[in-house]
Amino acid sequence: MALSLEEVRRIAQLARLRLSEEEERTFAGQLSAILDHVRQLEELDVTAVEPMTHALAAGELPALREDAVRASLAPEEATAAAPAREGTAFKVPRIIE
């Protein structure tokens, strides 16, 4: 099932993206292909597959670095270019009722 251009426009609006008509057509095709792959995955019988808590087995985890405090942006700087904010938080439209 292909996504309509109207659905792509709605997704872009929620993501606050401005897309050209060419980008809308391109993304409609790309997103439709992704959704088709997900539908194929949903059809797989995974009842015999043991659930995992991580994409890699415990012995295969890559070495993680130690946490280290580093300089970062102040909250005001990080949200300065946001189209809408409340204090130092990004303000976004509710998408889940």
From Swiss-Prot:
Q: Which reaction does it catalyse?
A: L-glutamyl-tRNA(Gln) + L-glutamine + ATP + H2O = L-glutaminyl-tRNA(Gln) + L-glutamate + ADP + phosphate + H(+); L-aspartyl-tRNA(Asn) + L-glutamine + ATP + H2O = L-asparaginyl-tRNA(Asn) + L-glutamate + ADP + phosphate + 2 H(+)
Entry's EC annotation: 6.3.5.-
| GO biological process terms held by the UniProt record | glutaminyl-tRNAGln biosynthesis via transamidation; regulation of translational fidelity; translation
Molecular functions per Gene Ontology: asparaginyl-tRNA synthase (glutamine-hydrolyzing) activity; ATP binding; glutaminyl-tRNA synthase (glutamine-hydrolyzing) activity
Q: Which UniProt keywords apply?
A: ATP-binding, Ligase, Nucleotide-binding, Protein biosynthesis
Tell me which positions the record assigns to the signal sequence. Answer: none
Which NCBIfam families is this protein grouped with?
gatC
What does the function comment of this entry state?
A: Allows the formation of correctly charged Asn-tRNA(Asn) or Gln-tRNA(Gln) through the transamidation of misacylated Asp-tRNA(Asn) or Glu-tRNA(Gln) in organisms which lack either or both of asparaginyl-tRNA or glutaminyl-tRNA synthetases. The reaction takes place in the presence of glutamine and ATP through an activated phospho-Asp-tRNA(Asn) or phospho-Glu-tRNA(Gln).
- What quaternary structure, including any partners, is listed in this protein's UniProt entry? Heterotrimer of A, B and C subunits.
The protein in question is named Aspartyl/glutamyl-tRNA(Asn/Gln) amidotransferase subunit C
